[in-house]
Amino acid sequence: MKLTPVSAAVLSVLAASQVHAKSDVFSMEEVVVTANRIEQPVSEVAGSIAVVTSEEIEQKGETELYDALRHEPGVSVSGGAGRPQNITIRGMTGNRIMIIRDGIRSADGFGANDNNDKVGRDTFDLSNLESLEVVKGASSSVLGSGAIGGAVILKSKQPGEFLEDRDFYVDATGTYTGISNKYKGASNLAFRSGDTESLVNAAYWQGEETRNFSQDLYNRDLDGYSASYAINHFFNDEVMIKARAELYRQDQQRLEGSSSIQKDGKWHIEDFAEDESTEEYSAYLGAELTPLDPTWFEELDTKVYWRHTEVITDTNRLMNSTDANGLLIKRRELEHKTFTDSTVGLRADFKQTLHASSAEHKLAYGVEIASDYYQREDNQKALDWTGSNASQKQPFASARAYNIGLYFRDMIELEKWTLTGGLRFDAHRLSPDGQNDIGGYPLKDIDSSEISPSLSISREVFENNRVYLSYDHGYRAPEYDKAYGFVSHDFVPLTPFVIAPNMDLEAETSDSFEIGNKFDNGRAQLYVSAFYNKFQNFIDVVTTGQDNFGNYVKQYQNLHGVETYGAELSAAYAFTSSWKLSTKLGYVDGKDAEGEYVRSITPFEGNVGLNYQQQDFNAFATWNWAGSMDRVPSCQTSLGQKTECAKTEAWNTLDLGAGYQITKDFRLSATIINLFDKEYIRYQDVAGIADESKRYSTEPGRYFTVNAKYIF
């Protein structure tokens, strides 16, 4: 329920007095999540959800999605600053993981084998996020198409979070991280005027590409900024009007690179320059209703929204070679690439509470209508002694997608039992935009629809201990680039190939099962879970034959039999109000129908942390580790030849950190990562690449972060 500013201020004072009165009792903070549309403490959710807060991100000096999620078993992020970042959850990766922010779906990424190594999923700034919730497993019964392997739910900061007991607030935060030599400044300005609250957030950063251990990667300089404005107007005790607008931009420059593959032999790079810009604009306008005398809903959250994401890459290569007469010849190659992903839509989410037959029903239901637009272009121009040769390619036909989703959830609480059922219907249409064919293949609309159910049951077997069993269905409509793509690689020596479109693709689906136990008495926590995921119509590339020009023809097709499974454990114990020990560990395995290991599974991994908190001072030590990884599929070289996939050795590192509240308004914290400067490779960073190509994929050596925050 939304409160007017006066009501919120009164309640905050009362809450503060209650906390002070109970200061002699200590317990770990209870985390409440909304990933299933119904607020629940994470200890009572029948499933696995990880939460990262803005306070944790600030104090550890984390500036990348990669940093924020690196301590969560079963969850990993490849890439880093200056490189596309891609999320993996329990063996599923790429666009099978949905990222949704304030109810608005984030842009897809792209890259070979779902690596998203060309465009990543990190088109947002961490400094204006309140929290990240990671749903481990299918969540299509709540979020619809795209959440087949899991979801990351981002919540932006709101004005009221800064204005509980004041009418004006401003802060400034400065961060340095040695992993990318990045300097970042950010500020929040919140103010209240009558019944209207506003929040302005701005950030600017400069740095370099995330380094490896030897610091021998091509160097990339980057700078960027983000800005947002949110406004909430309390029309009365029942209605709040809200709006938010945000922009994000990051520019990257690289003056080092390699030559591209040429059809007329080997060429050497002489000069190289690449500029890349990533821009995202988003906005929404909505209202929240909390009727004082509710009838068929207690809360309504509705909004219309828009998001536009664009990535532009310009590459300039000067190459040289020697002709048959021994003369030095040169060729300049210019390339301009664009990637566009936009969405516009509206949604309405309702909540209601009913009491019937001695049971409490917490209901959540809603509707979403959205339209997406996708476009990629590739313009090339080559200049050499033969003249100028320009070409315009569109490897993927521009497309529009239309989706409507309806969902309903009911959480029933009866004594010690909790039963939660959910159902969502999605209808989806993918249509080519302005093209009837690509590469000589005719294009057509692709329609799909799906009913995605979920069901969970949990019981409190004794005080503070709950066992649960859950089932969730996942669904993803065919992606435009896998259906409408015609990509020629006829320049590849030995094994030239083309990727052909496929108008017969069907939607991917998954069935996720999880069983677990959660104990949490405020002082001790123990969460244990085991999971199994079965995927049907899994879309992957296969070789179908050869064309009339001798090129191998590859195509994305629906496959069967992909499955992943594993187990996770999370435990914590507060010895005193100052000392806490915690540990997390996880294991993910999986194979396809041919018995090949799933590329994106992870080794046995985890961490152990010791935290100290005493009044204005806190400190922590975290030991991170992972076992060796030899459960790998077969791979291909850049020339298409079969080879051994990369394997990794076991590793462990130690991180240290401390923070001090110097005054009530000024806080300083610092972290040392990889204290003993160990060289190692995370399997997640080399999954699915040839073993011979992994030498540049080491993690950084020892580095430090510093964060300072001042509240004016």
What feature does the model see in each segment?
Residues 197-200, 298-317, 466-468, 472, ...:
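Membrane-embedded beta-barrel scaffold of Gram-negative outer-membrane proteins
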Residues 475, 534-536, 581, 627-635, ...:
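C-terminal beta-signal and adjacent terminal beta-strands/loops
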Residues 13, 22-162, 181, 470, ...:
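Acidic, small-polar-rich N-terminal luminal/periplasmic segments of exported/outer-membrane proteins
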Residues 176-206, 215-255, 275-290, 357, ...:
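Transmembrane beta-barrel wall of Gram-negative outer-membrane proteins
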Residues 238-246, 278-437, 447, 458, ...:
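Face-selective signature of the C-terminal outer-membrane beta-barrel domain
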Residues 352, 357-358, 413-419, 428, ...:
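Gram-negative outer-membrane beta-barrel transporters
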Residues 113-114, 127-131, 136, 141-213, ...:
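Outer-membrane beta-barrel translocator/receptor signature
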Residues 156, 174-180, 193-195, 204-208, ...:
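Transmembrane beta-strands of outer-membrane beta-barrel pores
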